Amino acid sequence: MFEKALASIREAIYAILAPASLPPGAATPSGGTAFMIAPGLLVTAARCVPGGSGPGNRPCPGLSLVRAPDIGRGTEPATLVTLDRGKGLALLRIEAPRSGASLRLLDAPVPIGTPCAYSGFPRLAMDPAPLPGASLIEMFQGASVSSFARTQGPGGKPVSRYTTDAPLVGDASGCPGFTASGEVFGMLDCPPGDLRSAAPSWVPSMDIVSFALDNGVPLPART
């Protein structure tokens, strides 16, 4: 069901490479996933930006990314455009991207029960150092949308979230969730703590669209 969609999704997903200095010959761990929503502009989870999850921390302004089809061909530098801890979102920019492939964001909720999937690069712990042999691991997981709810977030602001019914595959924050058509319905934002008992939580695509437009990102027109 998702074979064609996954092929197009992979063209626009990126691994965020951990910024820690690694010894020569060491494996390259992932710091999470980002995906392109307009040429040169990407969205990820705030927690995937080093220093982005803690309110007292200063986010790292520069990152190194590698697009899924380009693994083994070199990385691309990216800069942080803006970060909103309340929404759990961050925007990144690649000034001269090798590829302009971007994903289409849905502008309305999907029905409960919609078959979906997600793909990307689970985050690996960097404190104090990568696990021996840990490296970039690209994963795919199928699921169904199980709920859509609006709750009160930080500062009393309303927050919308989807949940899905399949267990989490590690901390896959930043992964795009997509339907069989290849359209993105949300971005996975894993809660801190024990992921084995956590329900997958998704920032809805509508919130990503609003976040992007509020920050001057010209999203491609829908056809």
Predicted regions: what they are:
Residues 6, 37, 178-223:
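C-terminal subregion of chymotrypsin/trypsin-like serine protease catalytic domains
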Residues 28-31, 169-173:
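Short, small/polar residue-rich loop motifs at catalytic or cofactor-binding pockets
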Residues 2, 18-39, 45, 75-76, ...:
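A conserved glycine-rich beta-strand in the N-terminal activation segment of trypsin-fold
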Residues 5-6, 34, 105-109:
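Short, surface-exposed secondary-structure edge patches
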Residues 31, 38-85:
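Catalytic-histidine neighborhood of serine endopeptidases
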Residues 16, 34, 40, 44, ...:
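Terminal peptide-recognition signature
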